[in-house]
Structures are given as structure tokens and as C-alpha cells.
Curated annotation (Swiss-Prot):
Protein name as annotated: DNA-directed RNA polymerase subunit alpha
Lineage: Eukaryota, Viridiplantae, Streptophyta, Embryophyta, Tracheophyta
Keywords in alphabetical order: Chloroplast, DNA-directed RNA polymerase, Nucleotidyltransferase, Plastid, Transcription, Transferase
EC number of the protein: 2.7.7.6
Record remark: domains: The N-terminal domain is essential for RNAP assembly and basal transcription, whereas the C-terminal domain is involved in interaction with transcriptional regulators and with upstream promoter elements.
Gene: rpoA
Family to which this protein belongs: Belongs to the RNA polymerase alpha chain family.
Entry GO terms, CC: chloroplast; DNA-directed RNA polymerase complex; mitochondrion
Location(s) in or outside the cell: Plastid, Chloroplast
Chemical reaction(s) catalysed: RNA(n) + a ribonucleoside 5'-triphosphate = RNA(n+1) + diphosphate
Record function comment: DNA-dependent RNA polymerase catalyzes the transcription of DNA into RNA using the four ribonucleoside triphosphates as substrates.
Length: 327
């Protein structure tokens, strides 16, 4: 087990693993922190990350079994201790790791008497077994048992309802979820307007991925969801009842900000308070509530940052720049 003391960063936002352990071949645990965060950000990130960890990460499972020895899935076979249903349930529990895409075939071909475990599965090169000791069946007599297996990589659940009795092929309910559980908690520190948060994220996996690998994959999946928003070239605003549609180009906030900084000395910005700018009361109150007190605070925010302020609009950003350019 690896455990580190938690040191709170006061500068750059960063992830850190503070605890890592392997409880068994099929149970890994990791605890991570992200800090420093503004009030409310930890819960937003924690909820999104937990959902991505539990629902967006792909896993590999056995999804079908076929054998000439099996008449139907609730039958008992002479020379085998377990029922067919129990064997299918045991195959469902096998933990696999792979980077395959599509479907692959595997095979079990054993002669009794003896125990059949996961190590008896003949796998394609792209797939490996996490725990070779996982039990599948017990052969009590000198019989031959051959089972063809179908392996797939997917995400979430796959509940197979239909059986194909004609070719003696039986579906297996698959749980493509390497992350068994994920929790997040929040620790707040600081006072008043300076209050910040630390996000603690706990991850348990089945061994096919480490918690760190799961965290990276969940993060990539979330990033990919938001990338399309970075390529938006225009904003579309819909009026009441969608009767009219107005399309406006993105406001060139950055260009005007650069020009403004060229005209004025940035060093002086920190000594100019926003109440000196003669802003409309609503805009002034919105900025104050967001801890923007000086001109430097204001200019350190992008157009996107300002629009995120509650009750703040695109027109307010334009009005602010118009006022600043006259100063």
C-alpha cells in the first residue's frame, strides 16, 4: 500500500494520488485529490467524474458460451458437479484485460477428472486473464468438456435475453465495468471570499485497470465530450416561441483587450477599483459578487469567464469595454 500526506496546493490546479493499494488480484483501490478549487467546482467535477468512471469506461467480458455437451442452460451434465447455469455464472465472473475491438473467440477444452479454472481458457493474444484461479467447473469423472467462448469489449451492461438452442450457444449477461465503485468528497478551507475546496476521489477497480488508468480514461472521455464546444464559430440566440432566429458572431473580446492593454500600463490596473469606472449598478454588483474588485481582476477574466457570472450578459461585456476605452 502506498500512502502520502495530503499537501494542499495554493497555485496550479493539479491531481495527485495520495493512497494506492492492491487488496487482491481483483480489487484495486486508489484515492486522489484535486486542488485548489473555487467553491462549487469540486462537486461539479466530482459528480461528472464519478459518472464517467462508472459508465464511460470500457471493459472486456465473456458474452457467449457454446458446447455440444449442453442441452439447455438449466440442465445438469453427468460427470460435472455444477449445473450449466452455475458454469455460465462462473464464466460471467471472469475478469479480462484487453485492448481489442470487435469480437474474439476463446476455448476451454479439458479432460476430467479435475478442476477447471480461468487458466484453462485458451485466449487470443490481445486478451489476458487477471486472476487465473477463478473457478469455472469441477469434472468428477473422466469426461471431455469443450466450451467455445465469445469475448467482447464494450461499456455498461449487456443483458442477453434470447437463447439459440439450435447451435447449443448460450448468452452470458456481461458487466463491462472495470470500475466497481467510485466516491467523491469535498474538504473546504479558508475564510470568507477566499474559501477554496479540495476534491477527494476514491476509485475501486476489478484489476483489469488500475485506479490511475481508470481516472485517465474517464478524464479523456469527459474532455472528448466538451471538445466540440471549443470549435463553435458562432452563437445562435432563439427569441420567444422560436419565431425568429438571430445569429451573432462571437464578440472579439480578446482583440479589444489586447488593444486596451497596449494603450494603458498594466501595473496601474491593480490600483484602479471598479467603483471608479462608473459602471451600471447591476454590472457592478455582479462583478463584486464574483470577487472582481480592481481593473486588473476584471481584465484577467476572458469573455467566457465573464459570461459565466450569474445574471451577466454579452451586452454587459460590450458595455464594460466601451467604458474602459473612453477612460
Amino acid at each position: 500500500m502506498v500512502r502520502e500526506k495530503v499537501k494542499v496546493s495554493t497555485r496550479t490546479l493539479q491531481w495527485k494520488c495520495v493512497e494506492s493499494r492492491k487488496d487482491s488480484k481483483r480489487l484495486y483501490y486508489g484515492r486522489f485529490i484535486l486542488s485548489p478549487l473555487m467553491k462549487g467546482q469540486a462537486d461539479t467535477i466530482g459528480i461528472a467524474m464519478r459518472r464517467a468512471l462508472l459508465g464511460e469506461i470500457e471493459g472486456t467480458c465473456i458474452t457467449r458460451a457454446k458446447s455440444e455437451n449442453i442441452p439447455h442452460d438449466y440442465s445438469n451434465i453427468v460427470g460435472i458437479q455444477e449445473s450449466v447455469h452455475e458454469i455460465l455464472m462462473n464464466l460471467n465472473e471472469i475478469v479480462l484485460r484487453s485492448n481489442l475491438y470487435g469480437t474474439r473467440n476463446a476455448l476451454i477444452c479439458v479432460q476430467g477428472p479435475g478442476y477447471i479454472t480461468a487458466q484453462d481458457i485458451i485466449l487470443p493474444p490481445s486478451v489476458e486473464i487477471i486472476d487465473n484461479t477463478q473457478h469455472i467447473a469441477t469434472l468428477t469423472e473422466p469426461i471431455d468438456l469443450c466450451i467455445e467462448l465469445k469475448i467482447e469489449r464494450n461499456r455498461g451492461y449487456s443483458l442477453k435475453m434470447s437463447n439459440n438452442f439450435e447451435d447449443r450457444s448460450y448468452p452470458i449477461d456481461a458487466v463491462f465495468m472495470p470500475v466497481q465503485n467510485a466516491n467523491h468528497s469535498i474538504h473546504s478551507y479558508g475564510n470568507g471570499n477566499e474559501k477554496q475546496e479540495i476534491l477527494f476521489l476514491e476509485i475501486w477497480t476489478n484489476g483489469s485497470l488500475t485506479p490511475k488508468e481508470a481516472l485517465h480514461e474517464a478524464s479523456r472521455n469527459l474532455i472528448n465530450l466538451f471538445i466540440p464546444f471549443l470549435h463553435v464559430e458562432e452563437e445562435t440566440f432563439y427569441l420567444e416561441n422560436n419565431q425568429h432566429q438571430v445569429t451573432l458572431p462571437l464578440f472579439p473580446f480578446h482583440n479589444r483587450l489586447v488593444n486596451l492593454r497596449k494603450k494603458k500600463k498594466e501595473l496601474a490596473f491593480q490600483y484602479i477599483f471598479i467603483d471608479q469606472l462608473e459602471l451600471p449598478p447591476r454590472i457592478y454588483n455582479c462583478l463584486k459578487k464574483s470577487n472582481i474588485h480592481t481593473l486588473l481582476d476584471l481584465l484577467n477574466n476572458s469573455q467566457e469567464d465573464l459570461i459565466k457570472i450569474e445574471h451577466f450578459h454579452m451586452e454587459d461585456v460590450k458595455k464594460i469595454l466601451d467604458i474602459l476605452e473612453k477612460k
